[in-house]
């Protein structure tokens, strides 16, 4: 028998997906977000949020395990906020999205 362990893939837990989808459903209903995608890798998981169907993700919630569970919110490779708490990252996203209108 082969006793080699398969590498564990990082994923979002059920309650984490629920928290993200709760906000996602609100944002999609007001037309701010259009779609999402989820990626799972050995060292991280990403919930990507798309504001347009033509372009790549506008926002990414990334979960990784370096020392502990850690969440990062980024937009176009710029880190907006990071925390050990998913709730803090989601609260950052709850702020209204403001656009300058001329």
Describe each PLM feature range.
Residues 2-3, 54-78, 95:
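Short aromatic-glycine-(Arg/Gly/Cys) micro-motifs in beta-strand/loop hairpins
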Residues 32-60:
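Amphipathic, interaction-prone secondary-structure segments
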Residues 1-43:
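Negatively charged, low-complexity tracts enriched in Asp/Glu with abundant Ser/Thr
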Residues 1-8, 78-102:
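Mixed-charge, Lys/Arg-enriched low-complexity segments
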């Amino acid at each position: 028998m082969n006793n080699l362990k398969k590498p564990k893939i990082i994923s979002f837990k059920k309650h984490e997906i629920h928290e993200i989808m709760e906000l996602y459903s609100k944002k999609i209903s007001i037309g701010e977000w259009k779609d999402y995608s989820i990626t799972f890798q050995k060292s991280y998981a990403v919930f990507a949020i798309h504001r347009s169907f033509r372009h790549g993700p506008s926002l990414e919630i990334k979960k990784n395990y370096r020392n502990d569970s850690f969440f990062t919110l980024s937009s176009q490779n710029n880190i907006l906020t990071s925390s050990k708490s998913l709730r803090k990252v989601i609260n950052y996203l709850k702020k209204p999205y403001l656009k300058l209108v001329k």
